[in-house]
Amino acid sequence: MQLNSLGFPRIGRRRELKFALEKYWRGESTQAELHEVARELRRTHWQWQVAAGIEQVPVGDFAFYDQVLTLSATLNAIPDRHRGEGAIDLDTLFRVARGRAPTGTDAPASEMTKYFNTNYHYLVPELKQDQVFSIAYEQFFDEVAEAQALGYKAKPVLLGPVSYLYLAKTVGQDFDKLSLLPNLLKAYAEILARFAAQGVTWVQLEEPILALELTHEWQAAISESYQALKTAQVKILLTSYYGSISHHQALVSALPVAGLHLDLVTAPEQLALFANALRPDQILSVGVVNGRNVWAAEVDLIVERIGSVARDLCSQDGSRLWIGTSCSLLHSPVDLEVETTLAPTLRQQLAFAKQKLLELANVRQLLQAPESVAAKEIVNTCLARREAKAQAADAKVIARVAALTPADYERVSEFTERQAVQQRKYRLPLLPTTTIGSFPQTPAIRGLRSRWRKGELSDAQYTEQLQQVTRDTIDRQLKLGIDVLVHGEAERNDMVEYFGEQLEGVGFTKNGWVQSYGSRCVKPPLIYGDVSRPKAMTVDWAVFAQSLTDKPVKGMLTGPVTILHWSFAREDISRDTIATQLALAIRDEVVDLQHAGIGIIQIDEPAFREGLPLKQSEWQAYLDWAVNAFKLSAAGVVDETQIHTHMCYSEFNDTIAAIAAMDADVITIETSRSRMELLNAFEDFEYPNEIGPGVYDIHSPNTPSVEAMVHLIEKAAQKVPVRQLWVNPDCGLKTRTWDEVEPALKNMVDATRELRRRLG
């Protein structure tokens, strides 16, 4: 009974890779020094895995930027603009990812987008109609040799051919990506032959698209691919993750592969279905430890769930069952051992990547020797952990959720009635101008926060300094002539962490970093218990800012769905229950802001779409509870209080009904890069509420002209009635400088005034 590691985080437990990359990019180290850091990380991570009982270490999970990009380089699928004169090398990959590198000519970076429904981002392969695939980069093979030289048995892991094509985009002429499959399969066959020549036994080919609802053409591509690769002199472990593949069971079970890996964390019900169809010569790898979360596995319950199938397989041949993580541990922080300041009650609930390896060994221990002393200790630990969790439950929060009624989710009046009341109260001009919330987080502001956290500034000194920043932010907006102001969020380091630090049931780590892309790492909050708000979180800052002007200043909050999706959320209750608890906490803040005289309140939901399940047939169930969570957070106010929300997506057509159901008085969205084409969804749906389509791209340092913004506002007015329109940037301005922000906002206000003159 082997233990199966699908992949391990590459960043290092103290983000060693991040710092080495950035040092190299700044020109402060050599490529040889960067490679040495990478080798040491791989060596350490392999050592940990072998020490935990992993017999075949994953190789190919390490990447200097992104594993999909590494595969593109291996396949010679690099855009021409990034190639340079010589062979593909590491700097080539950096030019693809970042648009520049220490060597070579700068060129626009490739597109980056989220990997399925995770918060990890991959570089989208760009494929031409005449694309020729061939081995052009040696990293995979070099690392196999490196592992073998250290005495380890290597199991290469790489994205399968069909998922690779699915994730790619076509460039140049419009054509069917699947027309490239035959040539791609020849390259994959060559890769597998190279692995075989190195003495590799097993290769993990990942086809995460199996968790999607695939068309007939893509299903046929799966079948064609693995028929073509069946002659390889290596054993293929066909690997799925992020969801059930039971809807493709007949297809998958017929494939000529030596083994199959199932994600039993997201879809435990598929075990029996595939186990019953397993051929006598196949192995089954069961992904039972969650690779995407931080919570200690309930090992005893896992064994209860898989026990009968496991015993049946092992009675035939003990080597036919592998115990694995649900997916790569890439999505988990590296090592709990470096967390020295966590409360013991929270620490005992956690397992990071290194600890999850030991959990695999614990599952095997319970399966093989359930009566042993070690097994009984494992069970007792699980029981004690669950008992502690039960004792920590907040009865008041649970009772409050249980007592909710349908009326708690609805505003007092319909939108048209609220709109009339709000227009009389605020008397805003046609095309009111506003911003999305944050203003530049200058080095001075970051320095203040750092000194305060170190104890070099008292709370009073810190508050006084930030009040001066807020005065300046309000003053700048008044001089620009913006209609609805914001306080600028100088006191906030992160839009989720700021709220999480003030909520009961939410904790934070010092080193719980996970890779988002390249050298960018994030440290998500831990929602470990029932969530409540012990006291007001933003009211003082909103009231202070409002005291500086007669113009309305928006209260700024992060919505419950976004806080949930950007956190590691507990697994012992449903995600919709957690969202409801968060919504009640935000609702309390909304009500307090209203009572303090803040009449316009924005509840941001940038991650609303990120929670959509991979299978479209499951979308509605998610949208129902996500919409309800937002409505619950916003519904406790009177008609005069205007609720805004902000979303930044590239697609609205398939969720426009849900967005309308949220019933925000005003929604601001990211549209400038699409030249307002995204508004087609709102036009076709006849979206009833007010909308602020972004009129300039805040991600660019360029100053948009008055004429360009006039044109965009006019385009928007062709799609949405002008009296429903607001004017605003695409997103928050936190990452820009004041030298960039002020000219852009001045032009935005001037463009709006020009249109008001034209429209009378």
From Swiss-Prot:
GO biological process, one term: methylation
Region forming the signal peptide: none
Alphabetized InterPro entries for the sequence: Cbl-indep_Met_Synth_N, Cobalamin-indep_Met_synthase, Met_Synth_C/arc, UROD/MetE-like_sf
Active site: 699 (proton donor)
The enzyme's E.C. designation: 2.1.1.14
Cofactor: how and how many bound: Binds 1 zinc ion per subunit.
Top-rank taxon: Bacteria
Keywords, sorted A to Z: Amino-acid biosynthesis, Metal-binding, Methionine biosynthesis, Methyltransferase, Repeat, Transferase, Zinc
Enzyme class: transferase
Involved pathway(s): Amino-acid biosynthesis; L-methionine biosynthesis via de novo pathway; L-methionine from L-homocysteine (MetE route): step 1/1
Residues reported in the UniProt entry to bind Zn(2+): 646, 648, 670, 731
Residues that, per the record, bind 5-methyltetrahydropteroyltri-L-glutamate: 15-18, 114, 520-521, 566, 610
Molecular-function GO terms, alphabetical: 5-methyltetrahydropteroyltriglutamate-homocysteine S-methyltransferase activity; zinc ion binding
Keyword Amino-acid biosynthesis attached: yes
Binding, L-homocysteine: 436-438, 489, 604
Cofactor dependence: Zn(2+)
Catalysis: reaction(s): 5-methyltetrahydropteroyltri-L-glutamate + L-homocysteine = tetrahydropteroyltri-L-glutamate + L-methionine
Residues noted as binding L-methionine in the record, renumbered to the chain: 436-438, 489, 604
Role noted for this protein: Catalyzes the transfer of a methyl group from 5-methyltetrahydrofolate to homocysteine resulting in methionine formation.
Family, similarity comment: Belongs to the vitamin-B12 independent methionine synthase family.
Protein's name according to its UniProt entry: 5-methyltetrahydropteroyltriglutamate--homocysteine methyltransferase
